[in-house]
């Protein structure tokens, strides 16, 4: 019997196993997960800690038992793959519960081990990272048992911003620090001013160019010389790929430890595939490699791999657009396309508009700031970013579709808006971007 082994059982691994079973009722499918829990909604973790998601069961989407019963897929949690022998088509697995190692064979191997949270190595019982359900349960238990009143959040990526927002809404007073002034790096830095405004409005303290030197009890010592007491520290300081077990195999890794894949999500070894946060691929709209560790790519990868294994070789991955979005209190920040740093690869022009999200006379109108970058040579859109209280997601999604179909900046004047006063304006902000681009 054909045996498919999957490494990792969260977004990428659980989804690809499920998609394969949908098309293939015969193959044996075994999934190894190094952690305790499978198929949890990791994007929900900050919202669960903020009591926005009101039940732990809503975060856990499946268990090994329910997965096997529904799909005839074996999931083995607390089983860490430690090495790959791609010559013999075997892997070595460490069973954390039994404290034993064993080898198992595969015909097809699919790698979705994800990433681990970077740690500041503070050696403190009040310091936590947030990456999985075990982290989440530990933080939730700590908050309840210690009646946490205040918290220090380190880092201004999505985890840092979302956990700060949710701790505040839970009634815990947060302070934010970051090691530089460069925050929320997927956004243009001047468009992040609303992050500072939202914290100022709520008297939330924040400091940039600040780092922790040590923690003694509840006393946090900073590089600036300040010493402040906190009940809880949550670190959101980036991630690293879980690729140590791959390094002694023939599977190619890039210089950061990620796995390059082709448009079928194959590695350089034909019967080994990879998906999720562990991979690098390419952008759809421009000729650049891309690492986009977000949920959409993992789910798209799962579908492509399943179709490939089922024999439909017409299905290929056309690339990322990098659409991303985050809520921070009353504001939404979103972008699509290359990162601000990657813009240096292009001869580009930029056009922006800052106007009411819907008709000015209709109540509740708020400002929406939209910025679009385009290639001067072919006038195709290469990046867009938006910030506002309403309508951000709609505009970024429209621009994502425009980029998917390689529309030029000038064609945005032809975008036909679904207009009524509560929703937009007769000349939407996307139309205005197109009109303004005529002068560029």
Swiss-Prot record:
Catalytic reactions of this protein: NADP(+) + 2 CoA = CoA-disulfide + NADPH + H(+)
InterPro entries on file: CoA_disulphide_reductase, CoA_disulphide_reductase_staph, FAD-bd_OxRdtase, FAD/NAD-bd_sf, FAD/NAD-binding_dom, FAD/NAD-linked_Rdtase_dimer_sf, Pyr_nucl-diS_OxRdtase_dimer
The protein's required cofactors: FAD
Residues holding substrate: 15, 19, 22, 39, 42, 71, 299, 427
Keywords: FAD, Flavoprotein, NADP, Oxidoreductase, Redox-active center
NCBIfam families xrefs: CoA_CoA_reduc, PRK13512.1
Job description of the protein: Catalyzes specifically the NADPH-dependent reduction of coenzyme A disulfide.
Protein name, entry field: Coenzyme A disulfide reductase
